[in-house]
Amino acid sequence: MTEQPDVSRRRIVQLFAGLPLLPLAGGSAAAALLSACGGGNDSAAPATRLMAVTFTGMAAPTLADPAKMATTTVGSGMNATYSDGKTQPYALAYQTFFITGAQVPNGSGGTTLSGGYYDINNRPIMDNSGSSPRQFFSDCPDGTSLLKLDAPTVAGVKGNTVFAVVQFEYTSANLKGDSMYGMLPSPIAVLTLDQDKTTGALTLVKYHNVDTSAANGLWITCGASRSPWNTHLSSEEYEPDATAIATDSQFAGFSRSLYGDATRANPYHYGHMPEITVNPDGTGSCKKHYCMGRISHELVQVMPDERTALMGDDATNGGLFMFIADKARDLSSGTLYVARWQQTSVANGGAATLQWIKLGQASSAEIKALADTLKAADILDVRTTDPADASFTRIPFSGRSNWIRIKPGMEKAAAFLETHRYAALAGGSMGFTKMEGTTVNTRDKIAYTAISAIGSAMTNGSGGIAIKGPSAGAVYALNLKDGQKDTGGAAIDSAWVPVDMAAVPALLSEDLATPDALGNTANADKVANPDNIKFSEKLRTLFIGEDSGTHVNNFLWGYNVDTKVLTRLLSTPSGAESTGLHAVDDMNGFAYVMSNFQHAGDWSSTLHAKVRTTLDPLIRANYRDRYGAAVGYLTGFPLLG
């Protein structure tokens, strides 16, 4: 069956139901839950505090029950221990807002297409490849933020008004079956949600597609985070190579979809950091920050100082980048750095101390002006074979060698518009592969970053890194310190600078020499190909979503950083990737874990050989013939008996 939300059957009490008993909740929610759980005495509510949380895991689904492999499956639970010594078990479940392609309320009495695509003039982009035209919609929802505003004005909300910002990375195929990857401008939507004041249940009231035309549209929006100042920080990964744009058919297709002209889009307008501001009426606005480096932006994590941003770079021969804004809560100007990996271990995912190279200081406005006017040939000369000219420098770039030479006076343009190449030239360690999500454990001053796959660039030394794997990736911990200097000896104006990097032992994948009985090529009881990661301060839990080419089903995990226990919480449909992860400790007294998936049934001929025949018809029935995907969240159901 499909995962359409059914409000009439919804009996959610809340996600992680113990959390409203925290002092942050108070009020009717805490009282109602104490009564429901047998407490009975409302006056006792403020004295009862959540002390600890542990999760109970679920087994990975198998072909013994194919239906569970073909949908989002949750068989996990939570035990909450309170200050009165009592422990309460809760089961977890998954609830959707919609399956993309559904008509959803537009807030004006009508409906609109969820996940729908629009051109630069906000006209629907139509798929004319099938027997009848239809508007394109995405099967790849990704980064999600949950937030609230002080004075919302959306009509029709009976409880608390909560907003979610959801971005859609790409669409896999048109009706004919041809790949559409990267050939459509990524949409972003603001969802207005009605939060039940007693149970915390969320109901979709309004869907609004954000106008991104002022930012020249968006390119392959992947992970996202919520800023400390309550905005949605988006992403644009796999920036188009401006030096080879004339032969880039993907970018030409993108330009044609966006502008109706295959040559109009400017590659230097993409690969930046978009920021979405939500308005009280449930609409939103978009601007791009051009001063944070033009890289394969997967996700940025802003530190508690509200100035320092650590950035995931989902690339081959990518780097670890840090941006320090000139002003708090303002990413429109600042200083860009790249890390140098000083290796201390090759085993178990490797380890290193980190040095920081300053690439430059700039404002978004000045780099935008350069992007508007410059071509690649104005900034640098690039060769893909050795020119036998000493004025060129060999660097690693996207899995191969480039020989580059910066044009006189173009260092700043190169630093912010050709960031990968310039960072390599400056001595940055450009050997990372598939650096994905980034998050922060504020109490311990530890950042975490996910390396989804340890590829050849991390093992062959081409980018200054030479470790032994495992190929299915790992989550790394980075200690954050004050008082650091860059490689030029200048003080770095931040107390949140990563000084070292090492894989977390419990979050190191395990490659299998021989596939298991289901076809997994990495141990299914360990994290493999980690992608989305988010840390919950109150739960002391690092949530990890997989983008795995080694697990038949991808999983969402919870890792307690104090007890070092890893627990499987959720399984996505086979062939799908776990996306949209966002852990929210307190939204009007309730906690939530947002979770989407994308491209269900994206079959690999080898990985899914044993399951495809059985699961493909089930997934097609569940998810609009594989054109749809779920946007939703993990919920908690109290066990009252």
Task: Describe the residue ranges of each PLM region.
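N-terminal secretory signal peptides
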Residues: M1-S35
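Conserved small-residue
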Residues: A45-G641
